[in-house]
């Protein structure tokens, strides 16, 4: 059984002056489950994990697991460019009850493909739950190549898939060809969900689902149920919104959008800052076109 199929939300982390706003996080989790979200990814890039303390990350993972209470899968972001730290966080997430892990490739260190195999092998041998690799070269300066997944599979059996955010559809096709249908591929880009699903992908780990969870669930479910035309049309319809949510570094626009929509998820953490006036006006105009802003905004 795959970790999930359909729409997994890379959920934002709401903050207040005390730190993580757990009351608001709980409200968001309940809303996502009601709206049909198929999995929750906690402590990812969109969740600003890189500017959370380790204690905050662990509290957020534990809280999410307990709040979801088995209704949908909880996938914990536990990656690090320090292998030992990634192991520690992965062991914690497993002990807290996470269903799976999302582990980014090491950033900044710029290891080799051989180093990637060693890194993920070390993490995988410390846990039993499934691991989904997160490949996002634009953030890590490192691209995990298709043949590296095959080499890794010779060493471990609980690395079950990849969140592919390279933007290279040919690379995704090659991963699918080399690894076969049992290897789970999820789009890491909201504007490539249906193209990646057409190559055997099972869904998306989505930023856009933070503001329109029902729509992303509907689109991915349509494809999974064989309604290719509906899924394609929805992808094309939503792409201008996807573009607006990446006009500045994620999660700046999506968190701004959520606050504009009345979700009150609080501030960004430095070094992320508020949007420029020009980009903010553009974001507002796009949100308005999709009927996502109240008249007061």
From Swiss-Prot:
The source's domain of life comes to Bacteria
Q: Which InterPro entries match?
A: Aldolase_TIM (IPR013785), DapA (IPR005263), DapA-like (IPR002220), Schiff_base-form_aldolases_AS (IPR020625), Schiff_base-form_aldolases_CS (IPR020624)
Which residues does the UniProt site feature Part of a proton relay during catalysis point to? 45, 108
Keywords per UniProt: Amino-acid biosynthesis, Cytoplasm, Diaminopimelate biosynthesis, Lyase, Lysine biosynthesis, Schiff base
A GO term for molecular function: 4-hydroxy-tetrahydrodipicolinate synthase activity
State the active site. Answer: 134, 163
* Record field: catalytic activity: L-aspartate 4-semialdehyde + pyruvate = (2S,4S)-4-hydroxy-2,3,4,5-tetrahydrodipicolinate + H2O + H(+)
Q: Name one GO cellular component term.
A: cytosol
Q: What is its EC number?
A: 4.3.3.7
CDD domains the record matches: DHDPS
Q: Name its pathway.
A: Amino-acid biosynthesis; L-lysine biosynthesis via DAP pathway; (S)-tetrahydrodipicolinate from L-aspartate: step 3/4
> Pfam families annotated for this entry?
DHDPS
**Example GO biological process term?**
lysine biosynthetic process via diaminopimelate
The positions annotated for binding pyruvate are 46, 205
Q: Provide the leader sequence positions.
A: none
State the compartments where it is located: Cytoplasm
* Record keyword Isomerase present: no
Q: Where is this protein chiefly located?
A: cytoplasm
- SUPFAM superfamilies from the UniProt entry: Aldolase
Entry-linked PANTHER family: 4-HYDROXY-2-OXOGLUTARATE ALDOLASE, MITOCHONDRIAL, DIHYDRODIPICOLINATE SYNTHASE
Concerning NCBIfam families, the annotation shows:
dapA (TIGR00674)
Oligomeric state and interaction partners are given as: Homotetramer; dimer of dimers.
Indicate the family of this protein: Belongs to the DapA family.
User: What is the documented function of this protein?
Assistant: Catalyzes the condensation of (S)-aspartate-beta-semialdehyde [(S)-ASA] and pyruvate to 4-hydroxy-tetrahydrodipicolinate (HTPA).
Query: Could you tell me what this protein is called?
Result: 4-hydroxy-tetrahydrodipicolinate synthase
Source organism per UniProt: Thermoanaerobacter pseudethanolicus (strain ATCC 33223 / 39E)
Name the gene for this chain. dapA
